[in-house]
Amino acid sequence: MPARNPADVVVRSRYREAINFPDLTERLALRLSSVLSYMARAHFVAWHKKIGAPDFTDPAGIFTPLATVEIEVEDVAVDPRQPFQVRGETYLAKSVDQSGALRHLVRQGKHTVSDARGTLVARARLTNVFTRYHPDPARRRVTELPPEFGIGSVPSRVTELLGIEALIPEDRRPDFTEERERVWHYGQTDANRHVNGMEYLRSMEQFVADGLHRAGHDLRRLYFAGARLVYRKPCFRGEGYRRVAWYRGEAPLVVGGAFLKANDPPGARPAAAVELTLAQHD
């Protein structure tokens, strides 16, 4: 029997998490943009406790920022006095090109949140990519696990990375646009030294809601039930940006949006994309 690859370790978590009342809607349902805060211990803390955490003070170090996020939430009322039950697992994987050569090392996680009765409230799939902060794309790529992990160099598991092209069309004009430039601010950043991943979701939710309202949709009945996010390159405090969005489906209603950096040349690819799925209240 071949020796087990130590890089194929799976870290599992199971815990209770107190509900933060502002994370609930008027129907006492968990809002989409708050889901990941309840999964942080499962996806980040458990892994860092077992393998080790990055040194955020070392600009030359290896980091694992989120590259893709897939979230779904159920519009079910919960008891805010009873903690959520969180279950999750996280593991290493690699993506390869058509020839089978390694492209990226990643860490993925699959997590669920249930209420005290065991009713599913939310689920998510997260993917972090190993990278270095360097202006040269070739120098940013990490093709071997850091030796300090002590678990080998490359995992066996192969995965596919969600791409921006899966969320937004490239062959037609946006259905929603904004002409005025907006700017990211310091309060939207995190310890990875760039804009926090959930800020893109919150910003796009507001942009899409405004656009749907102008188009005649009834926002008293619609809610954001799911999101897929792809982060192609980071945004930083003080940077300007614009948002655009396209209708992607009708049943259910799906809107895909993109963030365009103000200083990028015309026709440049978006910095990030967010696909939102909407559902109706009963």
Region roles according to the model:
Residues 1-38, 42-45, 125-143, 148-215:
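Catalytic strand-loop segment that frames the active site of acyl-thioester-processing enzymes
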Residues 68, 108, 226:
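Short coil/loop residues immediately preceding or within conserved phosphate-binding loops
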Residues 172-275:
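Acidic/His-leaning functional-site neighborhoods
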